[in-house]
Curated annotation (Swiss-Prot):
Residue ranges the record marks as coiled coil: 268-295
Biased composition (Basic and acidic residues): 51-63
This protein's name: Protein FAM114A2
Keywords tagged on the record: Coiled coil, Phosphoprotein
GO molecular function: purine nucleotide binding
Family: Belongs to the FAM114 family.
Amino acid sequence: MSDKDDIETPLLTEAAPILEDGNCEPAKNSESVDQGAKPESKSEPVVSTRKRPETKPSSDLETSKVLPIQDNVSKDVPQTRWGYWGSWGKSILSSASATVATVGQGISNVIEKAETSLGIPGPSEISTEVKYVAGETNAKENENSSPVAGAFGVFSTISTAVQSTGKSVISGGLDALEFIGKKTMDVIAEGDPGFKRTKGLMNRNATLSQVLREAKEKEEIRTSNEVTVETDKKTHYGLLFDEFQGLSHLEALEMLSQESEIKVKSILNSLSGEELETLKVELEQLKETFSLAEFCEEEEEEKKGDEDFTKDITELFSQLHVSSKPEKLARARNTAHEWIRKSLTKPLAENEEGEKQSEAENTEQVNKNSIEDIHAFAIRSLAELTACSIELFHKTAALVLHGRKQEVTAIERSQTLSQMTIVLCKELSSLSKEFTTCLTTAGVKEMADVLNPLITAVFLEASNSASYIQDAFQLLLPVLEISLIENKIESHRHELQGQKPLLEH
């Protein structure tokens, strides 16, 4: 050990000038290096634990002497530099921890203010909700008590708070949107009285009688809460149509039509082969007669008198060979035309007599009353004429089904009923024109906004009446189909009965 110390001491003194020349530093640095080397020489006993070097040649001995010296120099220099960098790193870490603590405290204050203003739960409440995650985080913080770990703990708490806050905001926003949507639909349903009714009508198929009955019931409920019930009843088509038993006859006709349709389907399902094909051809011919041809109202410019209409309807019913007669229908039509003639002559006579101003004012009052009366009687006449027409169709269907003898074929009856339907529709159109002419004549001095709605209502109800009659005519198709099938079966029986005497002979 003494030899080794003697060798290392002069070499260390030589290393100092080398560092001064190589690093171009002042002599103070060399002194600091020497001072730093002195403690290292005191710690040399650690090197004595090394193995004794083996005997080597002189050249190897010189290299072996140089290498330990270089190792000692390289050890001394990094150790002195690490001490400098270590102290600098500690100062950086301490300043960083202080900065992080300050920033974390500021962020915590901001979060607390935001929580109090927005009503967001505090971190303590959030930590209880995510207890498992917070437990793991606290365990890691206990293991690593460095300032950096504390900063990460603050950031993890902030991220957890932000996540939970985001979830609560999103869920609350979705709940708000759902509430707004439901409230909007409720407002729409309340604002639109026909909203629920429209949805109900789309889910079911209503017949004509059901629609008319619902309209009548709705109007009765509406008019029951008003003072002028009688006035509204005079001008409401549905109530008047039911008053003349039109709705009852229409429902009965629908029942007969449905029963006949079921029978026709069962008969067709029981047949096959040539009989089925022959019957289908005949039924198709019958359906063609129920397609009403478009008629032009301007073709008949000359107005028919009361006798002409009664004569035409009576002749058509005689061709059906049924016991019913259109007396009630003809009487309703004649009553309407007679009232129109009287209402047209009344204003003319009043205008001739009214010469003074007082008389003119009385004439205006009479004209106002006559306009309302004309409109009310027009609606009443249209409803009565339509109800009588549907009553005739109902009676005809019942007589065709229950009649024993069939003197005419089903196709001939369908052609007659088609002509009758066209005559009735033309009569309704002509009657509405006469009523509007009467309204125009009586309301010459009236404003357009008073007279036009009345005229429009008359034309509208006349169009509806024609549609009801055409629908009732279509309900007769299954009835006549049953009549055709029964007539064919009966003729087939007569043929078989005629062939039996020939076979006996």
